[in-house]
A protein has these predicted regions:
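Short, solvent-exposed turn/loop segments enriched in Gly/Ser/Thr/Pro and often Arg
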Residues: 35-42, 84-89
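Active-site-adjacent "subsite" loops/lids of carbohydrate-active enzymes
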Residues: 1-28, 39, 102-118
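C-terminal beta-strand-rich structural cap/linker in extracellular carbohydrate-active enzymes
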Residues: 275-299
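Conserved beta-strand positions
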Residues: 30, 35-37, 82, 237
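A structural motif
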Residues: 29-30, 171
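Active-site-proximal substrate-binding groove within the catalytic cores of carbohydrate-active enzymes
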Residues: 65-271, 287
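Aromatic- and acidic-residue-enriched carbohydrate-binding clefts of CAZyme catalytic domains
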Residues: 1-12, 39-69
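Conserved structured core elements
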Residues: 11, 15-18, 32, 56-67, ...
């Protein structure tokens, strides 16, 4: 068995399962489907199931039934989150960016670095909006209090760090817990970060240029680019160390569409004009606070 113990989708049970799913969406008008665990089904050796002959055709027929449902959903305009990259070709809208669930039992500071590594590694071949990541607000698998964000107000810095790097990358996260805020202070932090994301949503959902992979030893960062927007670039830079750092960073601006000059501002401040070199790079000097971040807008 591939998945341990999956029921056969090409049985009468499976046929009824798909019929009920379609009926539910037709009658309720819901337009989002979260489907975790269908995939292609385990091989099934039954010779009495109504929708396959035996072992040899069992996975093929199960896959076909799944494809029919997904294609119908796509044609109907239903948005599908399915943790299987292979289903992107048959209608699903989003897949996991790539993470191991047990790693969310690590201490909070390691989860933050791990989250950025997952995003960095998972956005080479697809847009940030094609994947989701994970943020465990309560204990997940294990790790105890050291791995848990709850109570959110007591661990607000770590909570904000997760939100900033998730929204700042354009990769939406599944926040696993019972609430998004537990105090007025936490609520204001959530509202502030979401408002920041909405202000820059178009560029934050654009393609990513990878600047430096997170390693916990020095700065890391990514840059969104889109030559069709007023904000043609958006840079997220992080400092995982316990000390403030100042670095001169070369930004590859070719895919912003800029050719000679760029106007670059930090954290919404006054823009400065920077000349691009012959390879369309622009050098910027930035100071990143300890265990913190900064961001640049390029026009």
């Amino acid at each position: 068995m591939t998945f341990g113990s999956s029921p056969c989708l090409s049985s009468e049970w499976g046929h009824e399962y798909f019929r009920k799913i379609r009926s539910f969406f037709e009658k309720t008008g819901m337009d989002v489907f979260e489907h975790d665990g269908s995939y292609s089904g385990d091989p099934c050796a039954s010779t009495t199931h109504a929708f396959h002959k035996g072992l040899e055709d069992s996975q093929w027929t199960q896959r076909s039934m799944l494809e029919d449902t997904y294609k119908w959903m796509r044609a109907t305009g239903i948005y599908m989150n399915v943790p299987d990259m292979g289903t992107m070709l048959i209608g699903s809208s989003k897949c996991g960016v790539g993470y191991r669930e047990v790693n969310w039992s690590l201490p909070r500071d390691r989860q933050i670095i791990l989250g950025r590594q997952n995003i960095f590694d998972g956005t080479w071949k697809r847009n940030p909006g094609d994947g989701w990541t994970f943020t465990p607000l309560v204990q997940y698998h294990g790790g105890g209090a050291a791995a848990t964000l709850e109570p959110l107000d007591e661990h607000l810095d770590a909570y904000k760090a997760h939100m900033i790097q998730n929204y700042g990358s354009g990769v939406q996260s599944c926040y696993r817990g019972f609430r998004l805020y537990d105090t007025d202070r936490t609520k204001e932090a959530v509202k502030e970060i979401i408002a920041w994301y909405k202000e820059h949503r178009d560029i934050l959902n654009s393609d990513i240029i990878h600047l430096r992979r997170p390693d916990g030893r020095d700065w890391d960062g990514i840059m969104h680019v889109n030559p069709s927007l007023e904000e043609k670039g958006f840079v997220m830079l992080y400092n995982p160390t316990g000390e403030e750092i100042t670095r001169t960073i070369s930004l590859p601006l070719y895919y912003t569409g800029l050719t000679r000059m760029a106007r670059i501002s930090e954290r919404g401040g006054k823009a400065r004009r920077v000349r691009l070199d012959r390879e369309y790079n622009a050098e910027v000097k930035v100071t990143i606070p300890a265990d913190g971040y900064t961001w640049l807008v390029i026009k």
